UniProtKB/Swiss-Prot annotation:
Alphabetical UniProt keywords: ATP-binding, Cytoplasm, DNA replication, DNA-binding, Lipid-binding, Nucleotide-binding
Entry's free-text remark on domains: Domain I is involved in oligomerization and binding regulators, domain II is flexibile and of varying length in different bacteria, domain III forms the AAA+ region, while domain IV binds dsDNA.
HAMAP family: DnaA_bact
Source organism of this protein record: Treponema pallidum (strain Nichols)
Example GO biological process: DNA replication initiation
Function: Plays an essential role in the initiation and regulation of chromosomal replication. ATP-DnaA binds to the origin of replication (oriC) to initiate formation of the DNA replication initiation complex once per cell cycle. Binds the DnaA box (a 9 base pair repeat at the origin) and separates the double-stranded (ds)DNA. Forms a right-handed helical filament on oriC DNA; dsDNA binds to the exterior of the filament while single-stranded (ss)DNA is stabiized in the filament's interior.
Protein's name in the database: Chromosomal replication initiator protein DnaA
GO molecular function, one term: DNA replication origin binding
Residues reported to bind ATP: G162, G164, K165, T166
Matching PANTHER family: CHROMOSOMAL REPLICATION INITIATOR PROTEIN DNAA (PTHR30050:SF2)
Region annotated Domain I, interacts with DnaA modulators, chain positions: 1-74
Annotated InterPro entries: AAA+_ATPase, Chromosome_initiator_DnaA, Chromosome_initiator_DnaA-like, Chromosome_initiator_DnaA_CS, DnaA_C, DnaA_dom, DnaA_N_dom, DnaA_N_sf
Domain III, AAA+ region, as annotated region: 118-341
Phylogenetic classification of the source organism: Bacteria, Pseudomonadati, Spirochaetota, Spirochaetia, Spirochaetales
Length: 464
């Protein structure tokens, strides 16, 4: 596409946005933009201020890029440049734009798909950094993207908060959408539920079924643990699953734990989810965390070459050593470092601990208590705090109690004698036995380690 073509479709994109927005919204956000230049697969747009650029890119950049793709058939990246005196209002397109429109009617540009997935543009395989702890899950995801509906169907990706489940799921969606003519639909479990309730109230359930049962070739649902204790939604998901599975459509779910542990999900849904492959994402190791930070710095410099940053290897290592909770915290720390560099021009290693004190575990007060662990474990296993600490010896209580003992030994500095007192006055030998039981099971049950990592993450979150 030539430069005029980019400008034409930019103006068409704004026209479409105007028709879909309120007048107040359009005048506040979109009337301040104007076309500056185009490059290969990129358009530079003028905005009135740096504050406006930050707010606008967070709220509307992906929406504009999707709309441009729908109209032109060409994917683009929007680049924003602050230009003082940006003209306001809906200015008429230049004469050369009208000429181009007459010769190249946008209506003649075929739409690539009948449905455009609402995917995060950064969640691709290219941006996913795979280490030893994610190698199997990464390989499975690539296999599904190359053979949707045939290998590993359904695919369930589970793990703790901020470990990359959504990224890996959406990377599959991006790849299938890019390389096939299949319709990819991505939705969070909560939005699936909200949409279903809305169609019930408006008596448009057929529209809902058409979208999820008949339009979808690939269905991605994030956070299916949301469906626990929601019988009506589970019923709808069950029939949607059956319809897609029988037609060999690809189904991908994410969850915060193995599906067998979703005790308030119907047994028939748990059974359906277990038909394919379940794979877990664990905490990234130190080397992987370093690689993730380096990759994100490279991506930032590629996206914003005019304000590229330099972060030394020493800073990268220091951050990676002190943030081992999840990738989301790494991203948050990097964002803060970038903001500091934009203001100060550079960053040195001696500044990092104070700058990132809320992220660094070593800088946080040690407030993890046995009581905190007991509450987290009780909530996770859906049992009462008093039962967990009490004298009950049925299996549904003893096993979570042993897990709580194991976590307490790892996350606190109490002796086994002190832990025995915390666990209702038990003997220290009971604590030792419980911890040894869990240590032994870790060797034979890989999913247990993922579950323990999830619980550790929840404990850390509870003291923030």
């Amino acid at each position: 596409m030539d430069a005029v073509g980019y400008e034409v479709f930019w103006n068409e994109t704004l026209s479409q946005i105007r028709s879909e927005s309120t007048e107040a919204e359009f005048n506040m956000w979109f009337a301040h933009l104007f076309f500056i230049a185009s490059f290969e697969n990129a358009i530079e747009i003028a905005v009135p201020s740096d504050f406006f650029r930050i707010q606008f890119s967070q709220k509307y950049q992906e929406k504009l890029e999707r709309k441009f793709l729908e109209l032109s058939g060409h994917p683009i990246k929007l680049l924003f440049a602050v230009k003082k005196g940006t003209p306001h209002g809906n200015t008429a397109p230049p004469k050369h734009v009208h000429t181009y429109l007459e010769k190249n009617s946008p209506a003649e540009v075929p739409s690539k798909k009948s449905f455009h997935p609402d995917l995060n543009r950064d969640y691709t395989f290219e941006n996913f950094v795979s280490g030893e702890e994610t190698k199997f899950s990464h390989s499975a995801a690539i296999s599904v993207s190359k053979n949707p509906g045939t290998s590993y169907n359904p695919l369930l990706i589970y793990g703790g908060v901020g470990l990359g489940k959504t990224h890996l799921m959406q990377a599959i969606g991006h790849e299938i959408y890019k390389t096939t003519d299949l319709n990819v639909i991505y939705v969070t479990a909560e939005n699936f539920g909200n949409e279903f309730i809305s169609t019930l109230l408006n008596k448009k359930t057929q529209d809902f079924k058409k979208k999820y049962r008949y339009t979808a070739d690939v269905l991605l649902i994030d956070d299916i643990h949301f469906f626990e204790n929601k019988d009506g939604l589970q019923e709808e998901l069950f029939y949607t699953f059956n319809e897609l599975f029988e037609k060999k459509k690809q189904i991908i779910f994410t969850c915060d734990r193995p599906v067998q542990e979703l005790k308030n999900l119907s047994s028939r849904l748990r059974s359906r989810c277990s038909r394919g492959l379940s794979t877990d994402l664990n905490m990234p190791c130190f080397e992987t965390r370093c690689a993730i930070l380096i990759k994100k710095i490279q991506n930032y410099n590629s996206t914003y070459p005019h304000k590229a940053i330099h972060i030394s290897d020493d800073v990268v290592r220091l951050v990676s050593e002190n943030i081992s909770s999840n990738i989301r915290d790494l991203e948050g720390a990097l964002t803060k470092i970038i903001a500091f560099i934009e203001v100060s021009g550079s960053i040195t290693i001696d500044i990092v601990p104070s700058l990132l004190k809320e992220f660094f575990l070593s800088a946080r007060p040690k407030h993890i208590t046995v009581e905190t662990i007991l509450h987290v474990v009780a909530d996770h296993f859906n049992i009462s705090y008093s039962d967990l600490k009490g004298k009950k010896r049925n299996k549904s209580v003893v096993y979570p109690r042993q897990i709580a003992m194991f976590l307490s030994k790892e996350l606190t500095e109490l002796s086994t004698t002190e832990l025995g007192i915390e666990f209702g006055g038990r003997d220290h030998s009971t604590v030792i036995y419980g911890c040894q039981k869990i240590e032994g099971e870790i060797l034979t049950n890989p999913s247990l380690q993922a579950n323990l990592d999830l619980l550790k993450s929840k404990v850390q979150d509870s003291i923030r």
